[in-house]
């Protein structure tokens, strides 16, 4: 479930940057949970030297540990390296080199969707857990230059 159950639908007090964050509840009993945004503009992720996808997330200590992932174009899935990322109670930045998606076959000049999910994508046989996550500041960046 994306958004709060009551108005306002976006989170206004528990944010990393700006004035709102996206709450995302997951319930993975014999399934996985995800939110997808279909892109109609800004689909060329090779322009201006962009090389990284960055997002900030925050969980709740009582969350059931679940794998966190990002998928592009509905197929290429990159998992966070911490299997209990859903239990991190401090805002945590996750930077994904876009080359990881390219290595999985994504045409970065034509990104049609981005998905943020929890659990094992495609799983319909293993019991999972529940929890509440917050997502903020999803952005593309050029590579960082070492000082």
Can you say where each PLM-predicted feature lies in the sequence?
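Extracellular ligand-binding interfaces
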Residues: 26-105, 110, 121, 125-134, ...
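Extracellular recognition modules
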Residues: 115-117
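Short, tryptophan-glycine- and acidic/Ser/Thr-enriched carbohydrate-recognition patches
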Residues: 1-7
């Amino acid at each position: 479930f994306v958004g709060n159950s009551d108005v306002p639908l976006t989170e206004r007090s528990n944010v990393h940057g700006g004035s709102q964050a996206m709450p995302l509840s997951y319930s993975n009993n014999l399934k996985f949970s995800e939110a997808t945004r279909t892109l109609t503009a800004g689909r060329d992720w090779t322009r201006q030297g962009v090389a990284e996808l960055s997002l900030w997330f925050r969980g709740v200590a009582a969350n059931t540990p679940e794998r966190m992932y990002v998928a592009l174009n509905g197929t290429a899935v990159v998992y966070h390296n911490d299997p209990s990322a859903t239990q991190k109670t401090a805002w945590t930045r996750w930077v994904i080199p876009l080359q990881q998606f390219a290595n999985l076959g994504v045409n970065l000049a034509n990104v049609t969707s981005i998905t943020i999910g929890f659990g094992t994508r495609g799983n319909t046989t293993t019991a999972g857990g529940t929890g509440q996550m917050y997502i903020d500041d999803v952005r593309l960046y050029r590579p960082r230059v070492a000082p």
